[in-house]
Every structure is written in C-alpha cells, then in structure tokens.
Amino acid sequence: MKKKEPELLFPKQPKRRKRMKHKKSILQEKNGICFLCDLLEGDTRQQYGLHKHHVFFGAANRKLSEEDGLYVYLCVRHHETGPDAVHVNKGTRTMLQIYAQETYEKTHTREEFIKRYGRSYIQ
C-alpha cells in the first residue's frame, strides 16, 4: 500500500520571474537603419542584423536603459568590430551617452538622471 502524502493547508505558490519593462527607444525609431551610420556618415540604407545597444550598459544600467528607452540599433561595424564601434572607441561611446542623457533630460531633470544612473555624462 502506498502512503498518502498529507495535503498542505496553504500550498506554496510557484515563484514567478519579474518581467522586464520594454519601452520603445526614445533615441531612434526601429526602422532598420544603423544609428551611427546615419549620424556619422549620413548613410540611411536599411540593414539586416542590427544589434540592440543599451547606451548605459552593465548589469544594473542595462535594465534601466531598457526601462527608459535609452538604446539604439547599430550595425556590427559600429557596435563591436570597427574603429568607431561603441565597445571599442571611448569617444563614440561618450558621444552616445551624452546624446542619451540630453534626450532623457527633455522630460526629466539632471538630478533625476544622476540619481538613476549614478553620474552625469555632460560636463
């Protein structure tokens, strides 16, 4: 004979992962054009395989960038491999961070930005 398991009066609810808030980018339309190709070279051709780049990356800031819509779509050359790539060239990365902060400050204050991201990128 099988032993019957006692039923719990208050069964545990399964744990649910918190869903990340996905907001549209406030920096760029999702139109298939690399943000930096357009900005630096005036190239507005549509490209396939664009990467989503969170302007303020890193564990905590990536989530905040996603929630605030602070991300752009970049081609591989401007994201990772080229000389002007944001993960290679500090000047390009800083330019993008300043642009994102200025856009964020159109609807918020600088103090709110600093409180949220830990520092100001505008000198």
Positions of predicted regions on the chain:
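A boundary/linker detector
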Residues: 1-49, 94-123
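Histidine-centered catalytic micro-motifs
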Residues: 50-58, 75-82
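Residue-level detector of alpha-helix boundaries and kinks
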Residues: 19-22, 59-60, 89
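Short Cys/His-centered divalent metal-binding micro-motifs
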Residues: 71-96
